[in-house]
């Protein structure tokens, strides 16, 4: 499946049904970026200083969501394929590893607002 496939990100932030929301993206990468941006916005509300985080903190954030999934368009079948929280976490890890490798082996991101 191509990372440039149309992707719908589905999120439920709390047990309340009215906390459900979704986003429409041109690619899996765009949807993952939006999810990480949501996490960064969450962190920036806690601190005015630049924020450093690693993948384990993103995982914790994702685990606290009542539900998170993606529907990714498969051009070969003409259907959307559902992806779970576990799959999303693996994709976040791969994305962060590719963008932010450090000599110590950890993946860290610094965000300044």
Curated annotation (Swiss-Prot):
List the lineage, top down.
Eukaryota, Metazoa, Ecdysozoa, Nematoda, Chromadorea
Q: In which compartments does the protein localize? A: Cytoplasm; Cytoplasm, Perinuclear region; Nucleus
Q: What does this protein do?
A: Required for chromosome segregation and cell division in early embryos. Component of the pid-1 and tost-1 variants of the PETISCO complexes, which have roles in the biogenesis of a class of 21 nucleotide PIWI-interacting RNAs (piRNAs) that possess a uracil residue at the 5'-end (also called 21U-RNAs) and embryogenesis, respectively. Within the tost-1 variant of the PETISCO complex binds to splice leader SL1 RNA fragments to possibly play a role in their processing. Promotes the biogenesis of 21U-RNAs.
So what family is this one in? Answer: Belongs to the E(R) family.
GO biological process per UniProt:
21U-RNA metabolic process; cell division; chromosome segregation; embryo development ending in birth or egg hatching; piRNA processing; positive regulation of cell division; positive regulation of chromosome segregation
Pfam families per UniProt: ER
> Please, which domain of life does this record's source organism belong to?
Eukaryota
Name the organs or tissues of expression. Expressed in the germline (at protein level).
Q: Null phenotype?
A: RNAi-mediated knockdown results in chromosome segregation and cell division defects in early embryos. RNAi-mediated knockdown results in defective activity of the PIWI-interacting RNA (piRNA) silencing pathway. RNAi-mediated knockdown disrupts the localization of tofu-6 to the perinuclear region of the germline. RNAi-mediated knockdown results in larger tofu-6- and pid-3-expressing foci. RNAi-mediated knockdown results in decreased expression of tost-1 in the germline and in embryos.
Which species?
A: Caenorhabditis elegans
Keyword rRNA-binding attached: no
Q: Name one GO cellular component term.
A: RNA cap binding complex
How does the record describe its quaternary structure? May form a homodimer. Component of the pid-1 variant of the PETISCO complex (also called the pid-3, erh-2, tofu-6, and ife-3 small RNA complex) containing at least pid-1, tofu-6, ife-3, pid-3, and erh-2, which is required for the biogenesis of a class of 21 nucleotide PIWI-interacting RNAs (piRNAs) that possess a uracil residue at the 5'-end (also called 21U-RNAs). Within the complex interacts with pid-1.
Q: What is this protein called?
A: Enhancer of rudimentary homolog 2
Show the disulfide pairing.
Answer: none
Q: Does the keyword rRNA processing apply?
A: no
**Keyword vocabulary terms for this entry:** Cell cycle, Cell division, Chromosome partition, Cytoplasm, Nucleus, RNA-mediated gene silencing
Q: Main localisation, per the record?
A: cytoplasm
């Amino acid at each position: 499946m191509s990372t440039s496939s149309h992707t719908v990100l589905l999120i439920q932030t709390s047990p309340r049904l009215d906390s459900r929301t979704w986003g429409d993206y041109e690619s899996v990468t765009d949807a993952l970026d939006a999810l990480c941006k949501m996490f960064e916005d969450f962190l920036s509300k806690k601190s005015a200083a630049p924020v450093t985080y690693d993948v384990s903190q993103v995982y914790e954030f994702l685990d606290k969501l009542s539900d998170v999934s993606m529907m990714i368009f498969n051009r070969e079948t003409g259907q959307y394929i559902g992806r779970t929280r576990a799959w999303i976490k693996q994709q976040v890890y791969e994305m962060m590893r590719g963008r932010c490798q450090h000599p110590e082996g950890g993946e860290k991101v610094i965000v300044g607002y």
